Design a protein with these regions (language model features):
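An N-terminal, well-structured beta->alpha segment
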Residues: 1-69, 95, 151-184
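Buried hydrophobic positions in well-ordered alpha/beta secondary-structure cores of metabolic enzymes
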Residues: 9, 47, 85, 98, ...
Length: 473
């Protein structure tokens, strides 16, 4: 039996290796025990799954196990996006949600994501308890289950369709009339994932012309990771370049919690820029007011927007769970990460790629400009900022030397004085000219993730080289 370990987005593993039916049963029982210990079991649990192999089978087994210990399941009838599951959890005031997803990981992975009563990703104190309970049970038959038929008769199993309630919320947050009146054609790419029938349907119902690609169920995700990053959506970019009628391309990942945005000429727009553009748009055009939250790895272009509008930015460790806390507490207008996660005030404290895409569509429709033009306009007001991330692979010797290297940082990086060291997640060095470097060690492989940001594009490569030299030198 392999050790159960929860990461930033739950427990994930490769099919038939770590992710087995026996291990799933143990984790589900651990969640059930956790809910009983917290006195929440009577509120019931929302169960959902993405488009991967056996998602429905694992979910039904989960419902049988929960019923065996008296916990009701609200079972999503088809593969369902993560933000929709979070929305349903909050709407029903359930005890939590169990979501079978590995998000943007390749097809041979699966996972369990547990969301507590707050609706956001579980915080470490919750996942640590579940993890401890699960590992104590490995190899033991500790669960009992009852059939779904008997569970339904006892009021412990109910099949649900959460889509319409979610759509109702989106219609309060997004100006669909503005999108429709613009007359623009939008290309939509759910990457064969659980976002099928969401972006396309709600836009079409609003009267928007939609061009679809990769919109049928495929557990192999077309042979690529279901991640809407530039390198995995060449076909989508090609479609937009070849169809002059398309003004905007909107993509979501395997469970639709992340987004990918393509401009009218086929240019991929980095999530860092989308977050800053939407923050500016919500204040300047929608007349809203509030602070932003971003992870330590996310661009300070968000900070420049905040300074321009006289509001603040809250910096968090990597992981949307920390941003979700601010959304739950109604402390921010928008929160996001450079890894394409975003949500806003009044919505779920969970990444929502569907909402992010729709807000971008609204922004383009209202502003009547391309995203490249909008970014240029933003730069003219707050200044240019350029960001890049690379991975640095380590030898065993270099990996062993890292703790001492970070414990004794240099006074300078190149010719720039280090003015502040931030260690809430990794080691971030703020430099005197406003540029910065962040080093984050992977928890699963001998890799350091290097993030670099400068105020002009020409110096970005130099700063990356200096960061690489610091690690490898």
């Amino acid at each position: 039996m392999s050790h159960i370990k929860f990461g930033t987005s739950g427990w994930r593993g490769i099919f038939c290796e770590e992710f087995t039916l026996d291990n799933v049963r143990v984790v589900v029982q651990a969640i059930a025990d956790h809910l009983h210990a917290e006195g929440l079991a009577e509120k019931g649990v929302v169960i959902g799954y993405d488009a991967r192999f056996m998602g429905g089978d694992f979910s039904r087994e989960t419902a049988r196990i929960l019923a065996g210990v008296g916990i009701k399941s609200y079972f999503c009838q088809r593969d369902t996006p993560t933000p929709v599951i979070a929305h349903e959890l909050l709407r029903r005031k359930a005890a939590g949600a169990i979501n079978f997803t590995a998000s943007h990981n390749p097809y041979n992975y699966s996972g369990i994501k547990f969301s507590p009563v707050s609706g956001g990703p579980a915080l470490p104190e919750t996942t640590n308890d579940i993890e401890k309970r699960a590992n104590a049970m490995l190899g033991e038959i500790v669960y009992k289950e009852i059939s779904l038929e008997n569970a339904a008769q006892q009021g412990l199993y109910e099949e649900i369709d959460p889509r319409e309630a979610y759509f109702t919320t989106l219609k309060k947050l997004v100006d669909f009339k503005a999108i429709a009146v613009s007359g623009m054609t939008i290309a939509v790419n759910p990457l064969y994932g659980s976002g099928r029938g969401y972006l396309d349907r709600i836009l079409e119902e609003a009267g928007v012309k939609v061009v679809k690609i990769n919109d049928h169920l495929d557990p192999y995700f077309g042979g690529k990771p279901p991640e809407p990053a530039e390198e995995y959506i060449e076909d989508f970019i090609g479609l937009i370049k070849s169809d002059e009628s398309v003004v905007l391309g909107l993509a979501t990942d395997g469970d639709a919690d992340r987004f990918g945005i393509i401009d009218s000429d086929g240019t991929y727009i980095e999530p860092n820029y989308i977050l800053a553009l939407l923050f500016d748009y919500m204040i300047r055009r929608k007349g809203l007011r509030g602070d932003a939250a971003r992870s330590v790895a996310t661009s300070h272009l968000v900070d420049a927007v905040a300074e321009y509008h006289g509001v603040k930015v809250l910096e968090t460790p990597v992981g949307f769970k920390f941003i979700g806390e601010y959304i739950s507490a109604d402390k921010i207008l928008i929160g996001g990460e450079e890894s394409a996660g975003l949500s806003i005030k009044g919505h779920v404290p969970e990444k929502d790629g569907i909402l992010a895409c729709l807000l971008v569509a609204e922004m383009v429709a209202v502003e009547k400009k391309s995203l490249r033009e909008l970014l240029s306009d933003l730069y003219s007001r707050v200044g240019e900022i350029h960001t890049k991330r690379i991975n640095i692979h380590l030898s065993p010797q270099l990996e062993a030397a890292l703790p001492d290297k970070f414990a004794n940082p240099p006074e300078k990086i190149g010719e720039q004085q280090i003015v502040e060291v931030i260690q809430i997640d990794g080691n971030k060095y703020l430099l005197e000219d406003g540029s910065w470097l962040l080093f984050r060690k992977s928890g699963t492989e001998p890799v350091v993730r290097l993030y670099a940001e400068t105020k002009n594009f020409e110096s970005l490569a130099t700063l990356i080289d200096l960061g690489r030299e610091f690690i490898l030198g």
